[in-house]
Design a protein with these regions (language model features):
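Juxtamembrane transition segments at transmembrane-helix termini in multipass membrane proteins
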Residues: 1, 182-198, 222-322
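Helix-coil boundary and N-terminal low-complexity module in membrane systems
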Residues: 1-140, 204-206, 283-322
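Nonpolar helix-loop interface/hinge motif
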Residues: 6-58, 62, 178-258
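Membrane-helix interface segments in multi-pass membrane proteins
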Residues: 50-89, 144-176, 234-277
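Hydrophobic alpha-helical membrane-embedded segments
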Residues: 90-98, 176-185
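Hydrophobic, well-ordered secondary-structure segments
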Residues: 127-128, 167, 171-174, 187, ...
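Generic low-polarity alpha-helical segments
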Residues: 130, 156-162, 210, 219-220
Length: 322
């Protein structure tokens, strides 16, 4: 392995060498602070576009809820309405992860892009990003069914006894391990789709190769730590707002419209969470992708050449996948 000590060529937010955890977090923070418009501003704009219609629809549907507890329809409209903002959050996250991967990719070379340039650079990749999300959902359902199917069927036929309960507990633990494994092996799908211009299926295969071997544990650890950090920050910000909203509804005598306000609060919480946390978590994934390509493919050499001589970023893989 090459000795990188003392090599600190830094045209942008990172030194062009293998990155430490501190390098990654510092670079993402620098990218967000140095380009608020294309990070948090774009996150706000995208979230508003996606969340406003779904939150409004959710509030309207939830407002149709009956408060007759003995009604067969009790809870139906409220549940549907309260869930609709989640769809808006999902759509926003699909677009945002792509936008932010592009912004971070340009920032690596010291290039500051605006909202318009980011849109131009990523809009053709949105169908592939959506396809990747669909494949992820299908895969999650398949894995869940494969692991929990037999234990649940046994519990349904034999009832809950010592054996079936133990089997269910073991199955749930196995499911958690499987999710963490797949979550790590598919960590770079979004970055690969946006930066390398690959399709959804090819991006999954590429991410699988880049996360193989010993780097798996490092990637898992960094992503897990990042998830804890952003979740904590989101809860610290969102929870007081949610509690204030609930108590405000009760104080104003709006219990009859609790489901409608729940949908609205869900949309507001999703908006705040997206603006505050998504730029950081998406930026970490993008930089981990760059880091793995530096370690495995010598991408730093190509990035140095591009930084010194100009030209488009060398994101499409210049070496044979391995």
């Amino acid at each position: 392995a090459p000795a990188y000590a003392g090599l600190e060529f830094r045209p942008g937010i990172i030194p062009l060498r293998p990155l430490s955890l501190g390098d990654v977090y510092s670079a993402v923070t620098k990218a967000v602070r140095g380009n608020v418009a294309a990070t948090m501003g774009l996150a706000l704009l995208t979230s508003l576009v996606c969340l406003i219609p779904f939150t409004a629809l959710g509030a309207w549907v939830a407002n149709q809820e009956t408060l007759e507890f003995d009604s067969e329809e009790f809870g139906l409209y409220g549940t549907i309405g309260s869930s609709l903002p989640t769809i808006g959050s999902l759509l926003a996250s699909i677009a945002l992860t792509g936008f932010l991967a592009y912004v971070i990719g340009q920032a690596v070379l010291g290039r500051k892009v605006g909202i318009g340039e980011t849109w131009d650079g990523t809009k053709r990749r949105l169908p592939a990003l959506a396809g990747a999300v669909v494949l992820t959902i299908v895969g999650a359902v398949a894995v869940t069914g494969a692991i929990l199917g037999v234990p649940i069927a046994l519990a349904a036929s034999q009832g809950f006894n010592g054996f079936t309960v133990m089997l269910l507990v073991l199955a749930f633990l196995l499911l958690v391990v499987a999710y963490l494994f797949l979550w790590t092996r598919t960590a770079f799908v979004t970055s690969v789709i946006v930066l390398e211009g690959r399709g959804a299926f090819n991006a999954f295969a590429r991410s699988w190769r880049l996360t193989s071997g010993r780097p798996f544990w490092r990637i898992l650890g960094i992503r897990f730590l990042t998830s804890i950090l952003v979740s904590t920050v989101a809860q610290v910000i969102v929870l007081p707002i949610a509690l204030f909203g609930v108590f405000g509804i009760i104080a104003l005598g709006g219990e009859s419209q609790i489901f409608m306000w729940q949908a609205i609060l869900g949309g507001v919480s999703g908006l705040i969470s997206a603006v505050i946390t998504t730029p950081f978590s998406a930026g970490v994934d993008a930089l981990l992708t760059v880091d793995q390509r530096i370690r495995r493919e010598g991408l730093d050499v190509q990035l140095i050449h591009t930084a010194q001589h100009g030209g488009p970023p060398p994101w499409p893989s210049a070496v044979q996948d391995r």
